[in-house]
């Protein structure tokens, strides 16, 4: 939820250093992210923008249509459901009609491989299901920031926008960020400061199959797992629910994006107000001794909304909706004492 353009530094604390400051919460280590602050000088405006492209590259080796048909035939033959069990296994037209011929448009891809009673595997047709589950992902991010100040007052502010189109249809992310920080020194020993980071993001998660009929997984993998010789639409362009009629659990997922919504919204504000007093600027013997009190509130609102229409696989004949909101309010109050002293140029206490 932090704009990368606002990050000044990242520090990892572990072991005693993390528990000394954060107690039990820091037992597994702490990652400190320091955001940018104002610097002395004239006010400067800065813009940073990026555009990136991404693609889904799948190295999984899948069976082609001919290979799949051969394995399905052999499985049926071993169960006594294909050909003549008293003869050696071989392609059989009548067996193919019984096993694969329930849906005419899908069957056409196999039927065309039978010429004059002879099976020609190189003539089997196939359909590229996976092509419907991929697209070129585009991400563009823009940040406008301003910084400046004097030795008495410094300020920094930025506004960021990110939009991402995922490599799968139906997936997207949009985020707005706001970062402000001010630091003032009204009198020499005292420093006052305030920082705030706010973000608002919406994510379209895309389709996730939760029913066992097609197999759980995302949209691309559901499509990529479909039987390669089957087709999603008939010759008139109508949707085919069961492309392989022999198995009613194989359901066509190609239109599922129309029937399902899976959206998350997240709004978050982190703030920090602090005062730091340098005792060394009041009395020379206390040089290096500083006290800091810091208050950090955190507000978060999260919402998950899922809707599955009755016509979809997850809906399974019923309109189903799920709405889960959550709110979080937390704060920390730190009282910190620092002492850093160098003695005889080579010895440092702190």
Question: Where in the sequence are the language-model features?
Answer:
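Residues embedded in well-ordered regular secondary structure
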Residues: 1, 37-169, 207-210, 256-263, ...
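Short acidic/polar hinge/loop motifs at secondary-structure boundaries
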Residues: 1-14
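Short, glycine-/polar-rich solvent-exposed loops and beta-turns at beta-strand/coil boundaries
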Residues: 2-5, 23-27, 171-174, 208
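Extracytoplasmic
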Residues: 5-7, 26-30, 42-46, 270
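Non-catalytic regulatory/gating segments with a bias toward low-complexity or hydrophobic composition
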Residues: 10-11, 31-33
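Structural signature of outer-membrane beta-barrel domains
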Residues: 15, 52-56, 162-166, 199-203, ...
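Flexible loop and strand-edge segments within Gram-negative outer membrane beta-barrel domains
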Residues: 56-58, 120-160, 164-171, 177-250, ...
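Flexible, surface-exposed loop regions and adjacent strand-edge segments
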Residues: 62-69, 174-177, 209-219, 302-316
């Amino acid at each position: 939820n932090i704009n990368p353009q606002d990050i000044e530094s990242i520090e990892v604390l572990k072991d005693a250093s993390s528990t000394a400051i954060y107690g039990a919460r820091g037992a597994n280590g702490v990652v400190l992210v320091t955001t940018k602050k104002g610097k002395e000088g004239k006010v400067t405006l800065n813009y940073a923008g990026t555009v990136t492209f991404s693609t889904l590259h799948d190295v999984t080796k899948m069976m082609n249509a001919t290979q799949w048909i051969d394995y399905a035939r052999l499985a049926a033959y071993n169960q006594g459901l294909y050909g003549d069990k008293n003869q050696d296994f071989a392609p059989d037209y009548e067996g193919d009609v019984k096993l694969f011929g329930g849906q005419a448009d899908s069957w056409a891809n196999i039927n065309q491989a039978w010429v004059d009673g002879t099976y020609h595997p190189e003539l089997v047709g196939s359909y590229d299901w996976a092509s419907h589950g991929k697209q070129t992902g585009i991400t563009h991010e823009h940040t406008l920031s301003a910084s400046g100040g004097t030795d008495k007052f410094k300020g920094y502010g930025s506004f960021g926008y990110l939009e991402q189109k995922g490599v799968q249809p139906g997936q997207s992310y949009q985020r707005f960020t706001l970062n402000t920080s001010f630091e003032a020194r009204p009198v020499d020993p005292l420093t006052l400061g305030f920082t705030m980071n706010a973000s608002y993001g919406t994510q379209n998660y895309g389709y996730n199959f939760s029913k066992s009929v097609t197999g759980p997984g995302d949209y691309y993998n559901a499509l990529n797992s479909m039987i390669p010789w089957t087709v999603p639409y008939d010759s008139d362009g109508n949707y085919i629910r069961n492309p392989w009629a022999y198995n009613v659990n194989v359901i066509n997922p190609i239109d599922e994006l129309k029937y399902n919504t899976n959206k998350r919204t997240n709004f978050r504000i982190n703030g920090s107000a602090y005062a730091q007093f340098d005792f060394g600027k009041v009395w020379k013997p206390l040089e290096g001794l500083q006290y800091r009190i810091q208050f950090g509130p955190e507000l978060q609102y999260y919402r998950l909304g899922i809707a599955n229409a009755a016509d979809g696989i997850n809906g399974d004949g019923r309109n189903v909706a799920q709405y889960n909101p959550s709110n979080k309010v937390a704060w920390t109050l730190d009282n910190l004492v620092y002492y850093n002293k160098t003695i005889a140029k080579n010895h440092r206490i702190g």
